[in-house]
Amino acid sequence: GATLASESGKRGLRIGHLETESGSVLSGYIKDKTGNDAFYMVGGDNQDANLAGRIMPMGGTNLNVKVGLVKEGTGTYRITANNNLVTGGLRILNGAVMVNNDLEKTEQEKLTGGIGHLANNASEAGVYVMTKGILGGIGSVGTTTDVYGTVAPGDGGIGTLTIKDFTGSAQPGLTLHPKAKIRMEVTDRDHHDQLTVGGLLALDNRMEDFT
């Protein structure tokens, strides 16, 4: 598969529509050197897309390099790779991001999952769901998640979204702000969406103060 990388320095790259296939890589600075960060803003064309390739710093080992995603537009992006390292975090400004990696494989093989953790395993939130954003899916998020918008486990049906790091690092938590919503599909008492959090669940009274 192909590799999409950036030049040196701190870069912001805006791509209206981005699709990646399994075997491809969405990366940062092409030379794997600390201090060169890349943030991809995607989804501006308001269409759905799949990110099936890996998302990680060049080489996949230098956790000091940030590779981040910013989701704009009203479409839905689906992330399906099992061993991503979105070291610069994910911000969902609008539309939806479905994290749909294979949860069983991720847990059994102790992989990083659909999102992974931040550069240097930083403890602050790595996923921000803004007021107009939705986070859903049936996979795993390996970093603390801060929600001003909506968390909706599943993707077109009953499912479980897991916020947990299977690599053995400190467990991520979930922070809900005043206007945050958790949207569940319930058929009956035995068939319903679930949200699993490996770390702490926190309530924070701060309103959205940035986008």
Model-identified regions with their sequence ranges:
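Aromatic/basic micro-patches that form nucleic-acid/chromatin recognition or nuclease catalytic surfaces
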Residues: 4-6
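Extracellular repeat-rich scaffold modules on cell surfaces
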Residues: 1, 19-130, 140
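Conserved Rossmann-like nucleotide-binding pocket used by diverse enzymes
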Residues: 14
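Extracellular beta-strand/loop-rich repeat segments of large surface/secreted proteins
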Residues: 9-11, 130-211
